[in-house]
């Protein structure tokens, strides 16, 4: 599926990228699961080296090894071996004092499970280094409750550190009309209503219907309720992510 909408968000991220050539930027991007944050971030990156890192719920040592490999591949920088994400982040901030690049931590809130001291360490490193840094740091997260606490709670170490905030919203009905017009120009009002009711404008759900070529009301219902449907376990997965598994 081609990239739709998000013109304002794309322009904003590209402006921030340009600003990072002279001053460090910390951008926080929030929005519900499957809304298209990662796709937007990748789409908006244009001119400088781009490091994308998904913060999985793994051991800190393993995450460090994965990130150092990505840094070596992207920047050609040999960082050695780390078992502390704080020390690795400090090394990356030092590199950013001589090189401009984008660093994305996707599902940033997961660091709370990896090492709950990381946020305090990050605040200290950022405060000491940012004035000489040219990093374009993007911190993306799907769990609004945790992301809001990390960045909006005055008691939290990263409170007030973000230089930019973006909250990604679902596609509007006009964008859904555009998508339907591109893929199924003869759509009816009932088709559009079903398309909206099932997806809610969530980019991943829209993409799934496009992949299934489900554009009529009848085909949309079959795609959602049919055997092996992507949507069958989605509600449970969303609740598990937000509130934890039993």
Regions found by a protein language model. Give the residues of each.
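Phosphate-binding site recognition
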Residues: 1-246
